[in-house]
A protein has these predicted regions:
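Extended, low-polarity segments enriched in aliphatic/aromatic residues
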Residues: 1-26, 34-47, 51-195
Length: 195
């Protein structure tokens, strides 16, 4: 995994792949678990990535694996931990900023993990399509941090995908996008479609 990240960021070694992270960071790893266990990031890969982030000197209690709901994480096989453990893991569970903010064409309340808690973000999704936006390679994952994603699916999510991600809460903190490609889906997403 370290070698893959090193190649993706153009650095010569797995050790150099830790460069995007600093010991003082609070790192949020936003998963995409909407499709349940069969089409979500594999627990083993997520935990290997947590180890990579920790090896950069980030305290494990400052590594937050999160999704829009604890229920989705549990359905994908993750254990909810708001304290202790090798890393924190929980859903935002409707804990939005009290006031909306805007970015381009969108106005939304963002999850506190991206607005105030985390100083560095990682999108960790799976290789799959979305029936309206197509394949976004992790960009659509960020719809899970706004309170009203249903409003932003028109015109194949254009320009809304870009507007959500270019908000300073995300654009100023996004260090990596990682996709689990062990299981891929090219039609029928975002839910798991066995056909």
């Amino acid at each position: 995994l370290g070698g893959a990240v090193a190649a993706a960021v153009g650095l010569p070694s797995a050790a150099a792949a830790r460069a995007p992270f600093r010991p003082g960071d609070t790192v949020g790893i936003k998963l995409n678990c909407l499709a349940g266990r069969l089409l979500s990031p594999r627990l083993e890969l997520v935990e290997a990535f947590v180890d990579l982030v920790a090896s950069a000197g980030v305290d494990r209690d400052r590594i937050i694996v999160f999704e829009r709901s604890s229920r989705e994480l549990e359905r994908a096989g993750f254990v909810i931990r708001r304290s202790g453990g090798p890393y924190l893991c929980y859903g935002t569970d409707n804990q939005w900023d009290p006031e909306p903010s805007t970015s381009g064409s969108i106005g939304s309340c963002y999850a506190r993990e991206v607005s105030t808690t985390c100083s560095a973000l990682i999108s960790f999704g799976v290789v799959k399509d979305h029936d309206l936006s197509g394949v976004s390679a992790g960009i659509k994952n960020w719809y899970g941090v706004i309170h009203n994603p249903n409003k932003y699916h028109g015109s194949n999510c254009n320009p809304y995908l870009a507007d959500v991600v270019r908000h300073p809460f995300i654009a100023g903190k996004l260090r990596l996008t990682v996709l689990d490609g062990v299981e891929a889906q090219c039609q029928g997403g975002p839910a798991y479609y066995p056909g």
